[in-house]
């Protein structure tokens, strides 16, 4: 028998229908392992291949780190709950999960905005690119993204966990997402919800402003390019980033900006599952499948491993 505290929460989980639980568990586990593996491989390739030692790939390695931590914040607990009869999460663990979730998602918001700036410099100021995106500036940009995300976590987590909760402590979700947790509050949360709304709008508005400005200038530059080859190369440089931005920001807009009257618990779970489970797997695939440098680096590492294995076999 599991000992529970009166301050603990119960996560109702992703599914109501237990008949499909086995299939869903297998799919989520496969996606989780695939996402972690793909992102770790991406980080490894960027570190070992000198062709990938560029500002764009440095920022991409930061995205892979964020995605790995992001999916590890929610999915292991979800998988454990799916095989366990007890779906308890302690008050402290819930607070930690909220903080890590807010930090990772906030950092990713800012990083995607900074990656748009990187695209802008690469397309619009290619001759000054090494100066404008030198190592020191890349480190500062990455640190700024992490700081912005952690600021969101440090601001909203203490307020959320200090709201009085009483009565039912069953969270109709598969992790401690703030909107689902606040539904259990036994006090007026309108002021806090307004504060959260403002924070989320700012977290979206600042990066979206950078993205919109960057791509407006990129489109103007592409329009002026005389050659079709140059235009194609410019579009290729930015297309992967635009795809990731559309997926990630679309889901975030639904969750945190769209009024609650447009939400249902089941829809919220589906959208949350998409951007907490699926998106971290899609990001490395989107960037690698359409990128000759990444594919080339992977083939090079694979060839080296194959050669080493053949040498080891022949020596044996």
Curated annotation (Swiss-Prot):
Glycans are attached at residue 3. Residues 47-54, 118-136, 217-233, 290-316 are cytoplasmic. Residues 1-22, 77-97, 156-192, 257-269 are extracellular. It is found in: Cell membrane. Gene3D superfamilies: Rhodopsin 7-helix transmembrane proteins. GO terms for molecular function: G protein-coupled receptor activity; olfactory receptor activity. Its main location: membrane. It comes from the Eukaryota. Disulfide bonds join 94-186. Keywords: Cell membrane, Disulfide bond, G-protein coupled receptor, Glycoprotein, Membrane, Olfaction, Receptor, Sensory transduction, Transducer, Transmembrane, Transmembrane helix. Belongs to the G-protein coupled receptor 1 family. Odorant receptor. This is Olfactory receptor 2T11.
């Amino acid at each position: 028998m599991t000992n529970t505290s009166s301050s603990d929460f119960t996560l109702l989980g992703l599914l109501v229908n237990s008949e499909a639980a086995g299939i869903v568990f297998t799919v989520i586990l496969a996606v989780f392992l695939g996402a972690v593996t793909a992102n770790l491989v991406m980080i490894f390739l960027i570190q070992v291949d000198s062709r990938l030692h560029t500002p764009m790939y440095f920022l991409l390695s930061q995205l892979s780190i964020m995605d790995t931590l992001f999916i590890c914040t929610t999915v292991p607990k979800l998988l454990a709950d799916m095989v366990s009869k007890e779906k308890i999460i302690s008050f402290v663990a819930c607070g930690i999960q909220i903080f890590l979730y807010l930090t990772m998602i906030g950092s990713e918001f800012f990083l995607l905005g900074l990656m748009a700036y990187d695209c802008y410099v690469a397309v619009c100021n290619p001759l000054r690119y090494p100066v404008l995106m030198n190592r020191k500036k890349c480190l500062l940009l990455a640190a700024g993204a992490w700081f912005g995300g952690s600021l969101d976590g440090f601001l909203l987590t203490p307020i959320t966990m200090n709201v009085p909760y009483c009565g039912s402590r069953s969270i109709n979700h598969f992790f401690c997402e703030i909107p689902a947790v606040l539904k259990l509050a036994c006090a007026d949360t309108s002021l806090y919800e307004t504060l959260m709304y403002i924070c989320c709008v700012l977290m979206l508005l600042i990066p979206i402003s950078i993205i919109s400005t960057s791509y407006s200038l990129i489109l103007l530059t592409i329009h002026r390019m005389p050659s079709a080859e140059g235009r194609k190369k410019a579009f290729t440089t930015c297309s992967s980033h635009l795809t990731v931005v559309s997926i990630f920001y679309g889901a975030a807009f639904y969750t945190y900006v769209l009024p609650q009257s447009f939400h249902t618990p089941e829809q919220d779970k589906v959208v949350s599952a998409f951007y907490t489970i699926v998106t971290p797997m899609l990001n490395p695939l989107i960037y690698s499948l359409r990128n000759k440098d990444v594919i080339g680096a992977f083939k090079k590492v694979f060839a080296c491993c194959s050669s080493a294995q053949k040498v080891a076999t022949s020596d044996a």
